[in-house]
Amino acid sequence: MTRPVLILLCGIPGSGKTTWAKNYISKNQDFVHLSSDAIRAELYGDENIQGNPVEVFTLMQKKAVESLNAGHNVVYDATSMTRKDRAGIISMCPKFTHIQCNIIWAPIETCIERDTTRERTVGKEVIDRMLKRFQMPYYDEGIDEISIVQPGNFNRDTYFECIINAMKIPHDNPHHQLDIYNHCRESFNYAVEKNFDWEIREAAYCHDCGKPYVKTFVNTKGEFSDTAHYYQHQCVGAWIACGLTFNIHTIWLISTHMAPFLNEKYYKNLSPYLKTMVDQLHECDVLAH
């Protein structure tokens, strides 16, 4: 007997979630496709009407649970960018469900470009806001399997080179004497010297890869300053890193590396095993100056 499967999709607008879902279901007809857009159309007569998110996802979760309880497999097609977003459906799944999370990924610029050609466009500002909320899915959420789906024509070597080159800019911040790239390289060297696990080393090498994308001289009050700010760079960096590696642990570390600085509740509640990993990356980050 096989367990019913929930494939939870995760990705920003334009990443290709619905295209992936339709293609997958055409080859796996034992799956039910539930999408937040289709639920909006059902509730409000038009998927372009955002409506009440609570109403939309309550109905979507209800349909998913009914299908799983009936023994059907489900593709759950929504952005699911944060742990809170994902917790709604994960917590409601029957205990026998095999939960798989597929991150449907594409470079940020590709997603923004695709969005401009869609009938229902959300715009760059909305995509940027969603990127700054991204929390890398991880196994402590109750997920059994996590995969990254990259575009078929994607060249990872070229992308890696572009990201590294983008990091070769000054921090313009008193907390850092080195530029972004050399800070990350020194973090990596420190991890090697300390003989930390490969995931720590890999995360150290590109933990600040989101900084060039978010760099701003405007503070949270909207005031211009001489100091550069990098708000939510760990979130954007985690999305970027999905194109650099398939190592889920590495990307989760990048996504979480600011948690000790911010004293997040999530970080404080981590198991000793996971907290040690985050603390080791934090050590590399702090001492690489």
What are these regions (language model features)?
Residues 149-225:
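Acidic/His-rich, divalent-metal-binding segments that scaffold phosphate/diphosphate chemistry
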Residues 190-289:
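Divalent metal-dependent catalytic cores for phosphoryl transfer on phosphate-bearing substrates
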Residues 10, 15, 108-159:
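Conserved GTP-binding G-domain of TRAFAC-class P-loop NTPases and closely related GTPase folds
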Residues 19-72:
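Conserved substrate/cofactor phosphate-moiety recognition/catalytic segment
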Residues 97-111:
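Conserved phosphate-donor/acceptor-positioning beta-strand/loop module used by diverse small-molecule
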Residues 6-8:
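Short hydrophobic/aromatic beta-strand immediately N-terminal to the Walker A/P-loop
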Residues 1-3, 67:
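Phosphate-binding P-loop
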Residues 76-89:
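Acidic, metal-coordinating catalytic cores used for nucleic-acid/nucleotide bond scission
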